[in-house]
């Protein structure tokens, strides 16, 4: 008997054609049509980079987070048809590049700028590799531009900002600087510090309309203090006036990193160290523009100048920015030249009270040749001063020889009674850089007797006084005179700060 029994083979089909339902009681209804899947529609509001890559854009303004995370260059967002109709046939100057959107020019500012009859400069694009910032637009064309409403963020109210024409008239009347028709600084009758208040600045009444995320005190201070201080050494050049009073606020309106870095720079100008630290931290947390953009240079300039005036600073960051800004000088642009000239001056002002900063290297900027016909005296002096402060180990006699050659070239003489306070204080800077302490003291004594209220002269004189600390013996008459001069200019600066304050100001 065979113990093995053979069974017939059964072939099983392993592939089932029907659907398997875990519920045995489920019976499909053939009369019910399946629900169609929702079709995905492509949106036209994403950034150009994500649309080209065919991925979903999170539409974060001004930079897409997808591009930021992948270290790609965000090309911005296209304008809608309604915006293009509102713009008309004339478009505003393109002040931003790739990652930044175009800043808006309000009608009030544009129309007031057109009243001057001068041609202001605007940058076409800020990418140094492909575009040139020298493409200027006439201010008469800007008068037809209407402001564009942006949905991604609430823009700042620029109604409280002074127009370029108001700043132009203010600098002519109060800051002892010539117009374009004059080649040298001329003296003028200046109002007292107490008269420079809300009566002289009617636009301060609308400061309360600023958004809550912006400091309502610093932006008026920027226009009343920082802009006049910068434009005084530009000798009232229209391009510089328009850039610092109109273009830079538009950058700050559209980009939070520029706004916070600008407020940090204004805080340090106001001697507010805590506010400078606060805004500096906020600026570093904001998304930064592309590294090859003009906006990046502007933010880095404000951050560098703020850091050098603080007790703790990152010297590597400052030196790296100086090198990059010197490389950008090859771009033939009025805006880049303005930024380089301002940075050179502010670097000298930051180092002058300290005597020197070991490890600081400003030679790359001092070797840059920026030819500007409207301010050759100040540009040449501060360039030489930056080079001297970057080489503290060299002999003082070599530095003095360079400064003497500068005075002979531009016919600058300290004891000339016909000179304006601005040119006198420029010469005091030259003596302070070369450590001619007695000449600095004599020049500041002359300025103290003139009772000048120009904020550029006051601030520069105060910094020159600080450079004389621990120089004279405590029982000498020079020491007492230095203390009197420091007290005089310090009091005038405090009164100026109080006049720039839009809140209830206490009476001193």
Swiss-Prot record:
CDD domains the UniProt entry points to: GAL4 (cd00067)
Coiled-coil intervals: none
GO cellular component terms given for this protein: nucleus
Name used for this protein in its record: Transcriptional regulatory protein moc3
Entry function: Induces sexual development and ascus formation. Also involved in calcium homeostasis.
GO terms classed as biological process: positive regulation of conjugation with cellular fusion; regulation of transcription by RNA polymerase II
Gene: moc3
SMART domains (alphabetical): GAL4
UniProt entry keywords in alphabetical sequence: DNA-binding, Metal-binding, Nucleus, Transcription, Transcription regulation, Zinc
DNA-binding region(s) from the entry: 46-76
Compartments where found: Nucleus
Region called Disordered, residue ranges: 15-43, 110-146, 174-193
Assembly information from the UniProt record: Interacts with zfs1.
Source organism: Schizosaccharomyces pombe (strain 972 / ATCC 24843)
Keyword DNA repair: no
Biased composition (Low complexity): 176-193
PROSITE patterns: ZN2_CY6_FUNGAL_1, ZN2_CY6_FUNGAL_2
A GO molecular-function descriptor: RNA polymerase II cis-regulatory region sequence-specific DNA binding
């Amino acid at each position: 008997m065979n113990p093995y029994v053979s069974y017939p083979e059964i072939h099983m089909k392993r592939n089932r054609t029907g659907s398997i339902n875990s519920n045995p009681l489920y019976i499909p209804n053939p009369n019910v049509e399946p629900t169609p899947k929702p079709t995905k529609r492509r949106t036209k509001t994403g950034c150009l980079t994500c649309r080209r890559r065919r991925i979903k854009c999170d539409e974060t303004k001004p930079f897409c987070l997808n591009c930021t995370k992948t270290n790609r260059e965000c090309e911005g967002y296209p304008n809608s048809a309604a915006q293009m109709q509102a713009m008309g046939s004339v478009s505003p100057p393109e002040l931003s590049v790739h990652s930044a959107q175009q800043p808006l020019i309000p009608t009030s500012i544009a129309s007031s700028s057109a009243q001057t009859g001068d041609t202001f400069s605007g940058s076409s694009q800020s990418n140094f590799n492909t575009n040139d910032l020298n493409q200027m637009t006439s201010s008469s064309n800007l008068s037809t531009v209407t402001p564009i409403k942006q949905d991604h963020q609430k823009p700042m109210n620029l109604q409280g900002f002074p127009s370029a024409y108001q700043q132009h008239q203010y600098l002519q009347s109060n800051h002892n600087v010539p117009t374009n028709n004059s080649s040298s600084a001329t003296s003028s009758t200046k109002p007292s510090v107490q008269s420079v208040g809300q009566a002289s600045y009617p636009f301060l009444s609308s400061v309360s309309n600023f958004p809550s995320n912006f400091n309502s005190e610093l932006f008026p201070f920027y226009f009343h203090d920082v802009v006049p201080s910068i434009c005084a050494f530009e000798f009232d050049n229209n391009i510089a006036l328009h850039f610092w009073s109109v273009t830079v606020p538009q950058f700050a309106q559209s980009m939070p990193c520029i706004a916070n870095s600008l407020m940090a720079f204004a805080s340090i100008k106001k001697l507010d160290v805590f506010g400078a630290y606060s805004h500096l931290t906020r600026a570093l947390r904001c998304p930064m523009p592309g590294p090859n953009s003009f906006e990046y240079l502007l933010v880095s300039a404000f951050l560098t100048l703020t850091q050098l005036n603080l007790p703790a600073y990152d010297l590597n960051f400052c030196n790296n920015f100086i090198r990059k800004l010197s490389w950008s000088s090859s771009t033939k642009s009025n805006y880049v030249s303005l930024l380089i000239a301002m940075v050179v001056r502010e670097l000298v002002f930051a180092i002058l009270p300290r005597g020197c900063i070991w490890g600081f290297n400003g030679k790359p900027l001092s070797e840059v040749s920026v030819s500007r016909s409207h301010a050759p005296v100040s540009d040449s002096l501060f360039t030489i001063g930056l080079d001297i402060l970057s080489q503290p180990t060299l002999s003082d006699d070599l530095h003095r020889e360079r400064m003497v050659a500068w005075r002979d070239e531009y016919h600058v003489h300290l004891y000339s009674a016909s000179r304006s306070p601005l040119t006198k204080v420029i010469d005091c800077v030259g003596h302070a850089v070369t450590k001619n302490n007695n000449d600095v003291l004599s020049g500041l004594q002359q300025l103290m007797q003139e009772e000048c209220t120009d904020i550029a002269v006051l601030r520069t004189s105060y910094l020159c006084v600080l450079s004389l600390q621990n120089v004279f013996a405590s029982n000498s008459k020079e020491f007492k005179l230095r203390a009197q001069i420091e007290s005089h200019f310090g009091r005038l600066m405090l009164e100026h700060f109080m006049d720039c304050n839009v809140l209830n100001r206490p009476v001193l």
